[in-house]
């Protein structure tokens, strides 16, 4: 006798990952085994990004090195930078970010390497550049003048500085940093899942 067919997507495994685990029934989210409730508001986005990208929480020294890598990684190459005004005129925000990330990859010094070390460097640069790309896109759409990224500020603080044009309060940074931690990973975007279903 054949197995009873599964209705809908119940018990269907769409992907395997060591990064995050979602228990929808219990309303729980884990990053590399850590409950999101233990991370959000207690760790920084930089610590969480290190955990997701490198598999472990950073020591103080590793966090300082990773933070310096992120600061260096904020610099945009000419390919993305020069195209922001035109993209801001023609594309909606998510389309623009997709396009700008693709353009930024064209200037990436590790673009022709797929080694694990190069991929970690690319992940750090992508993490650092996306907030800058979004802020520059926003400025191009609104005509706002924005400050350059401040190497002394976190990703959350820098993004708020560049979007608003003013130094954010500690409370604003804490709230936005927690938001970044909460949204750092959720296994697979709905659009990616839909594309995989269509391709199957």
Question: Predicted segments — roles?
Answer:
Residues 1-200:
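Hydrophobic alpha-helical bundle cores within soluble ligand-binding/oligomerization subdomains
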């Amino acid at each position: 006798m054949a197995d009873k067919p599964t209705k809908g997507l119940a018990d269907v495994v769409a992907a395997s990952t060591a990064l995050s685990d979602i228990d929808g029934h219990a309303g729980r989210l884990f990053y590399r085994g850590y409950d999101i409730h233990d991370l959000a508001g207690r760790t920084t986005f930089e610590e969480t990004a290190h955990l997701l990208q490198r598999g472990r929480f950073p020591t103080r020294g590793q966090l300082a090195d990773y933070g310096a890598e992120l600061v260096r990684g904020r610099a945009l190459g000419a390919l993305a930078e020069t195209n922001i005004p035109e993209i801001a005129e023609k594309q909606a925000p998510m389309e623009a970010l997709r396009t700008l990330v693709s353009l930024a990859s064209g200037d990436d010094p590790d673009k022709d390497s797929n080694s694990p070390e190069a991929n970690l460097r690319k992940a750090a640069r992508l993490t650092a550049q996306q907030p800058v790309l979004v802020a520059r896109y926003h400025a191009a759409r609104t005509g706002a003048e924005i400050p350059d990224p401040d190497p002394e500020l976190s990703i959350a603080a820098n993004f708020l500085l560049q979007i608003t044009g003013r130094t954010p309060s500690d409370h604003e940074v804490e709230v936005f940093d927690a938001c970044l931690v909460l949204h750092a990973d959720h296994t697979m975007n709905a659009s990616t899942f839909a594309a995989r279903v269509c391709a199957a």
